[in-house]
Each structure stands twice: as structure tokens, then as C-alpha cells.
Design a protein with these regions (language model features):
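Hydrophobic membrane-insertion alpha-helices, especially the h-region
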Residues: 2-23
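Alpha-helical transmembrane signal-anchor/signal-peptide segments
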Residues: 22-44
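Short extracytoplasmic
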Residues: 38-65
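Membrane-embedded segments
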Residues: 55, 61, 65-151
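Well-ordered, non-membrane alpha-helical segments in soluble/globular domains
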Residues: 96, 224-232, 262-273
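Secreted/periplasmic serine-hydrolase-like ester/acetyl group-modifying domain
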Residues: 116, 129-241, 322, 330-334
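Active-site segments of SGNH/GDSL-like serine hydrolases
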Residues: 236-261
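C-terminal regions of proteins
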Residues: 256-257, 261-334
Length: 334
């Protein structure tokens, strides 16, 4: 029995030592120097290290609807060093956590771009804290030492093996060193028939015949949007010198036409919070009935636009930022 116990303890210690050496989430204060990069598929584990990286001075925060905003292009347009911290299906709670973590390590951040989409506009009575992907809250607090308590598990071991493969040149990073990944670049995946299947559930287009009114308006005051209650938390605590863009990213018109009043109400509420807390912020509303949102080939599915559209969004961010600097206020780009 003693031999068995000793063997188990020894094996466990070796496994834990391997995990600590590989530092799969780049979260340890002390670990051997290696050419690490994000390897965990779950961005909630991969991105805290990027949020702490002092090589950046600006960030994109949101869900997958702003994941295609490319840091390298934003850097050129805005004269900054961007990291994209947008995560698939990120709840507003997670977005607030990510923003606070970034600001802990970047108290003089130059730019913050927030994507406001269905994650904020959901009709709900309660707040979602996390998704089925799980949320390692210990990675988002100010104490990195406590991360060591949560690393002895099969997922950390799996990602340590991936990190070893990466260091040995046997694996590519899951995400770029600036958090970017283009998930829309497969030509086969962009065949129009497939795109329309993902948008409409059919191979033929079913565009709304009449224009869809998506202007911000107080049209559903009785609707409970619990997530929107956290929007003030997102904006609070951001340094006065940080330039903020609140972006309503463009989704396909078919998706928006299913419940336009909800989007109108959500945008009205978000705009009210921005005007109260950060009137210096830019509000860029692309969640509109437009040539962009009516063109099927601009989309990967009903929610996600492709890289060519992302580039147009980035240019719009740069234009509105410059207009705001010159004394503008609320800007819409159609």
C-alpha cells in the first residue's frame, strides 16, 4: 500500500511539475522562458495572458461578432497597439471581467472598442455569468499566485502537452499573439449556397421586402434586459484619457428583421448609458438596414460578417474616431 501511495504521489508530482514548467495559460509569475503562444481552444483560458501583456495599449472586447477586427489594421489606422480579446459567446459579465483585467495592467489605455450585440440585447430576467464553456474566474483577479491552485487537472495537462508541441514546432498557435484569428477564410465555406443555408436555413435568399427600422428608439420600455444593467459596469472605471468606441456590429438583415424592436430598444438604452457616463465616447451604429447587411456574400452566417466587411468596420471606426476628436458627437455610418 505504501508503495502504491508513494507511486501515486510521485506520478502526481511529476505531472504537476510538467504543467508548471509548460505554463499552458501563461498565467504563472515564475516559469521557464519559452516561445509560448495561446494554445487553449477556450479563449477564457487563453486571453487573460494577452490582457496582461504590457506590449499592448488598446483592446477590442466583445463576442465573436467583433473577433474579425484585426489588430494589425487597427494599429495602422489609429496609431496604437491593439489586442483582440473578444470571445465566442462571451457574456456581458465575462466582458466586464476582461475589461477590468486589461485596465489593471494598462491604466493608461489609449483605445477600447466594445462590441454591443445580442449578448447585451437579450430579453431576460436574469444575468448569465458564464456559458457551458466555463469561466476560470481565478485567472481574472489581481492575485496570480492563486492560479497555481487550479492547474492540477486534466485540461491543464492537455494544454501543457499542446504547449510542448508548440515549443517543439509541432503545433500552430490556436490564436495569434494579438488574439486574432480569421474564422471566415475558408473559400469552400464561403460558397453562397452554404452561406444562405446558414442564414436562412434554405439555399435561396429571403430578404425582407420593406426597409427594416432599426433606429434607436424607446419602443419596448417594459422589456427586461438584465444584461444591459451591466453596461454601466463596463464603462465605469475606464480612465478619462482612454478613447472609447461603442460599436453595434452589422449582422445580416434577416436576423435583425425577426425582432427589430428589441434592437431599437437595446440601442436606445445603451446610447443613454454612454451619454450619461462617457459623453466623450464614439457610438458607431452599423446594426442597420443597409447595403452591407442585405448582401448575403458579406456574411459567414446570419451573425458573423467576413473579413472584407471587418476591414470596412475598422475604417468606419477610424473615421468616426477622427470626427469625434474634431468635436463631433453621435455618428452613424450606413
Amino acid at each position: 500500500m505504501k508503495i502504491l501511495v508513494l507511486s501515486l504521489v510521485t506520478s502526481g508530482s511529476l505531472v504537476y511539475a510538467f504543467i508548471l514548467v509548460m505554463d499552458p495559460y501563461q498565467s504563472e509569475l515564475v516559469s521557464p522562458s519559452m516561445p509560448r503562444a495561446p494554445v487553449a481552444q477556450n479563449q477564457r483560458y487563453s486571453y487573460p495572458a494577452l490582457a496582461r501583456n504590457v506590449g499592448f495599449d488598446s483592446a477590442v472586447v466583445g463576442t465573436s461578432t467583433v473577433r474579425l477586427l484585426k489588430p494589425a489594421r487597427l494599429n495602422t489606422l489609429l496609431g496604437a497597439r491593439f489586442v483582440n480579446l473578444a470571445m465566442n459567446d462571451a457574456t456581458p459579465f465575462e466582458q466586464v471581467l476582461m475589461t477590468r483585467l486589461f485596465l489593471q495592467h494598462h491604466p493608461r489605455a489609449k483605445f477600447l472598442i466594445f462590441g454591443v450585440d445580442d449578448s447585451w440585447c437579450r430579453e431576460s430576467e436574469s444575468v448569465r455569468v458564464e456559458t457551458i464553456r466555463g469561466l476560470p474566474e481565478f485567472m481574472y483577479d489581481a492575485n496570480q499566485w492563486n492560479d497555481l491552485l487550479y492547474l492540477f487537472n486534466d485540461k491543464a495537462l492537455e494544454n501543457s502537452v499542446r504547449m510542448l508541441e508548440l515549443v517543439r514546432g509541432k503545433r500552430e498557435p490556436k490564436y495569434g499573439l494579438d488574439g486574432y484569428e480569421d474564422f471566415s477564410d475558408d473559400p469552400e465555406d464561403r460558397r453562397l449556397s452554404l452561406v444562405r443555408e446558414r442564414i436562412y436555413g434554405a439555399s435561396a435568399a429571403v430578404l425582407p421586402a420593406s426597409p427594416v427600422n432599426l433606429e434607436p428608439a424607446r419602443v419596448r420600455p417594459g422589456v427586461r434586459m438584465a444584461e444591459m444593467d451591466q453596461f454601466a459596469d463596463l464603462l465605469s472605471g475606464i480612465p478619462a484619457g482612454t478613447r472609447i468606441t461603442v460599436l453595434f456590429p452589422p449582422r445580416h438583415i434577416w436576423a435583425m428583421s425577426q425582432n427589430p424592436g428589441l434592437y431599437q430598444e437595446c440601442k436606445w438604452r445603451a446610447r443613454s448609458v454612454v451619454k450619461t457616463l462617457r459623453p466623450d465616447a464614439v457610438i458607431l451604429d452599423l446594426l442597420l438596414d443597409s447595403a452591407i447587411t442585405r448582401e448575403d456574400s458579406n456574411y459567414h452566417d446570419r451573425i458573423h460578417y467576413v473579413d472584407e466587411v471587418a476591414e470596412k468596420v475598422e475604417l468606419a471606426i477610424a473615421r468616426t474616431t477622427e470626427k469625434k476628436r474634431r468635436g463631433g458627437s453621435y455618428w452613424e455610418v450606413r
